[in-house]
Curated annotation (Swiss-Prot):
InterPro entries linked to this entry: Dimethylallyltransferase, IPT, P-loop_NTPase
Quaternary organization: Monomer.
Record protein name field: tRNA dimethylallyltransferase
Nucleotide-binding found in the keyword field: yes
Binding of substrate, residues: 12-17
Length: 319
């Protein structure tokens, strides 16, 4: 028998965090973060990481499990989630995967397999040096020549994954897209997949407001503190927003340019998330546009959970 799993996805700033806590409190769930950057300690403001006082007593997993200079791959994420789900179910709780990193979510719900491979840090450093020497877009163009499928999926600014894809190709001669396979016909869990959406103009306004709030909360100081302990080229420091603030601190961008770039790149990231999740045919979409939409969506998700698993009661057990 397949284990139960609720999957809650949506673009950045749509409101997944607060809604997921409300649902988890109602049905007795534990939340597994599906965000590839919230795994890193000390990267709190810029990743919109939930604060302990916001968790409402709901256990959260896969947050603050790595230092920023440590590697964290989708394969490791998949393995950790696969270990967590039976543990959560054994406690009589409902596992709920919440996030916006599409590949991470898909690796859990579909039958993805990954080719194990050691990291080549010298090769990665050389590739990053080539990008700095030749300018933005150089490595993406190289990737397009050897692995067009991955290049089409990755944004030219997603240097982390572009470097990883080129690393795999140089090590094996095989595109990384060919080493990741999925059987889409058979889900790995007895899942309920929910997608959150919102009017695009309202979402973009929320993104701009959230960036301003993060900066006012001390995001730049957070980046300064990280740079004291870690070099700017480590994987985590290439994350959205952190990279732009590092460029500002190095004098390569003005403050106004950095803020504008963060907002623009975050809006573009949200658009790519929409595109990715729209491909998931099993998602039930709920619109969060409007003042009462969030409460209605919470009630609807709770209803769907109890409809799918009728024995699911508050803090109860799925028999």
């Amino acid at each position: 028998m397949k284990l139960p799993l609720v999957v809650l996805v949506g673009p950045t700033a749509v409101g997944k965090t607060a809604l997921s806590v409300a649902v988890a409190q109602a049905v007795g769930a534990e939340i597994i973060s599906g965000d590839s950057m919230q795994v890193y300690r000390g990267m709190d403001i810029g990743t919109a990481k939930i604060r302990p006082e916001e968790m409402g007593g709901v256990p959260h997993h896969l947050i603050d499990i790595k230092d920023p200079d440590e590697e964290f791959s989708v394969a490791e994420f998949q393995a950790r989630v696969d270990a967590l789900i039976p543990q959560i179910c054994a406690r009589g709780r409902l596992p709920m995967l919440v996030g916006g990193t599409g590949l991470y979510v898909r690796a859990v719900v579909e039958k993805y397999t990954f080719t194990p491979m050691e990291a080549d840090h010298e090769l990665r450093a050389r590739l990053r040096q080539e990008e700095e020497r030749h300018g933005p877009g150089y490595l993406h163009a190289r990737l397009r020549e050897v692995d067009p499928a991955s290049a089409a999926r990755l944004h030219p600014n997603d240097l982390l994954r572009i470097v990883r894809a080129l690393e795999v190709y140089e090590q094996t001669g095989v595109p990384i897209s060919a080493t990741q396979t999925a059987a889409f016909s058979e889900p790995r869990y007895d899942d309920l997949m929910i997608g959150l959406t919102m009017d695009r103009a309202q979402l973009y306004a929320r993104i701009d407001e959230r960036v301003d709030a993060m900066l006012a909360a001390g995001w730049l100081d957070e980046v300064r503190g990280l740079l004291v302990r870690y070099p700017p080229h480590v994987r985590a420091m290439q994350a959205l927003g952190y990279r732009e603030l590092v460029l500002y601190l190095r004098g390569l961008l003005t403050w106004e340019e950095a803020v504008a770039l963060i907002k623009r790149n975050t809006r573009r990231f949200a658009k790519r998330q929409f595109t990715w999740f729209r491909k998931e045919r099993r998602l039930t979409w709920l619109d969060l546009t409007g003042p009462e939409a969030r409460n209605r969506a919470t009630e609807e998700i709770v209803r769907l959970i109890r409809e799918k698993w009728p024995c699911r009661e508050r803090k109860g057990r799925i028999e």
